[in-house]
Amino acid sequence: MAASFLTMDNSRTRQNMNGSANWSQQSGRTSTSSLEDLEIPKFRSFAPSSISISPSLVSPSTCFSPSLFLDSPAFVSSSANVLASPTTGALITNVTNQKGINEGDKSNNNNFNLFDFSFHTQSSGVSAPTTTTTTTTTTTTTNSSIFQSQEQQKKNQSEQWSQTETRPNNQAVSYNGREQRKGEDGYNWRKYGQKQVKGSENPRSYYKCTFPNCPTKKKVERSLEGQITEIVYKGSHNHPKPQSTRRSSSSSSTFHSAVYNASLDHNRQASSDQPNSNNSFHQSDSFGMQQEDNTTSDSVGDDEFEQGSSIVSRDEEDCGSEPEAKRWKGDNETNGGNGGGSKTVREPRIVVQTTSDIDILDDGYRWRKYGQKVVKGNPNPRSYYKCTTIGCPVRKHVERASHDMRAVITTYEGKHNHDVPAARGSGYATNRAPQDSSSVPIRPAAIAGHSNYTTSSQAPYTLQMLHNNNTNTGPFGYAMNNNNNNSNLQTQQNFVGGGFSRAKEEPNEETSFFDSFMP
């Protein structure tokens, strides 16, 4: 009885176990199919194919139910790895679906990223030298391209300067912000003026070519920042470009000697054209005569023209914005314009140096002072004069030497086209010989009664000198009338030529006293 009861009980237990196993398999398939449809990470739980269960010695409790055990949240979560509700234990299908999709995507991405990371880590070590080589090659190519662009820019700039030389006169050349050089076109320029023109806030500077007899000039306008905005060339160069803008001392001395020789030849040619001037002009011991080359100077003090300084005559009109209107008139204008409107041969300058305590030297002509300035290299001011005769182009400037304060340097330019005016209050005009007004040279005369000239040209009279005088011509060029002791003593001395002579002197009482003892 007891054995049969145990057999029945065991068979029932086996049936329950088989039923629970079959139910678990079906529920597993159902949950697996539903989870596959919801794209939840696949996890299959398989029941063992054969379970060897030994017959239990104790009868299971009636309160134990396999269905309750299978429906418990712990079993579902462990078997399907799906989160359940903490209160009811039921599956949350929507949340589980969304979370399953996201987790599936993340797991796939993580797997792919891990694969990519390992793969790229391995390949990066191999491809690193190639990348470095490419960078070096790119840098070298960039440097070569920059060098080529710089060479091309220099070539374009040189072509632009070469094209500038062939431009017509008075054509403006504009510059951008990167071409702010000081007009480096290969020629040597000298600045001779600067001023502010109307209608432009930029100052305008004036330059001329330093080559002898080259008429080329240019105007350069600069902005307030110092950038070149415009260059206007006037004229064309009649010489090739110099080889170097910086000459050595030997080449510079050779250049100046060549210029000096050319000026001497020019002066000899001008002197041969004017024989009357050469015959009537003589040098004196008290004067040092020299001629300056005037081929590269257009105005008074042009060589010492400083920036921002100018000399303007009060009676000259400013005919335009060009500084040529403020300069001296050319020889063609004074000679009636027979040169066809172009400057031909310029008169050389004549420099006279003498020693005097006063700056005003009486040379017989009348002058009017129109300017004064301090030039470079001499602390003493320079005064500018012009002849007061209407239509006379002669001008002069007077200054004291920098090495000797008593030495007065007078520079004349041009020649007078009129006679020497009569001295005020004297009959000088009636006693002088007529001269040809067409070729009257500049003859500086000494000051009457000046101490320097009296000591060098006169000596005290002695009785022996008077006894030895048996002719009408006394010593030192004095003409004396011995027959008439009471007549006036007339003295006349040609200082530098026949045109200038001393004024009449009053009778010398000492000489008249000595003449009274003559037989």
UniProtKB/Swiss-Prot annotation:
The keyword Transcription applies. It is found in: Nucleus. One of its GO terms (molecular function) is metal ion binding. SMART domains: WRKY. The keyword Cytoplasm does not apply. Residues 1-34, 123-212, 232-255, 267-349 are annotated as: Disordered. One of its GO terms (biological process) is response to salt stress. Zn(2+) binds at residues 209, 214, 237, 239, 387, 392, 416, 418. Changing residue 359 to A: Weak interaction with VQ10 protein. Interacts with MKS1. Interacts with ATG18A. Interacts with SIB1 and SIB2. Interacts with VQ1 and VQ10. Belongs to the WRKY group I family. Transcription factor. Interacts specifically with the W box (5'-TTGAC[CT]-3'), a frequently occurring elicitor-responsive cis-acting element. Involved in defense responses. Required for resistance to the necrotrophic fungal pathogen B.cinerea. Regulates the antagonistic relationship between defense pathways mediating responses to the bacterial pathogen P. syringae and the necrotrophic pathogen B.cinerea. Required for the phytoalexin camalexin synthesis following infection with B.cinerea. This is Probable WRKY transcription factor 33.
